[in-house]
Amino acid sequence: ENAKEFVLIDFFIVAEGGLWDKMHDILKRKIKEGVEVKFLYDDFGAAIRTRKYFKQILEHEGFEVRVFNPIMKYTSQLYMNFRSHQKIMVIDGKVGYTGGFNLARFGVWKDTGIRVRGDAVWGLTVVFLQMWEASGHDKEHVDYLKYKVMQDVQGDTWCQVISDGPVNNPKNPIESIYNQMIMYSDQ
């Protein structure tokens, strides 16, 4: 609700209902206030949980929308395992959220999410923009620096964002990092 410049959103599962409806109302209001909203979702995670023209409805409301790996009816090449399970939200380049949660309710469900401030937000922004570019049909390059915000955050916690999704495979940086941490551990 405090966004002034932009909101970047990337989720695997989007389901119409309480959680999405509340966020949708806030985002529509922010768009009317002039806030840029980029919304990216995985088609497999939303296809059976949203209405038929979900993307077009959002675009009509002023959202910039991209769908990762759209499911095309009657196609012989369905890439069902090539999905984006990333969950990212960046607000004005100052606050970022990520974790295991989706924009859907699944009954009693415990999950973890984190809020980050400082330079880690830029890491989430870059991951989002890489997926945004990969999900576009045009080859236009996104001006990443438009979303770079100089942070004035003090703290003693270090955080590094590492992307390991469809844009980065087959390199699997997360696996390499875990292997390296195990190799160099003292215990």
Language model segments and positions:
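Charged, low-complexity intrinsically disordered terminal segments
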Residues: 1-187
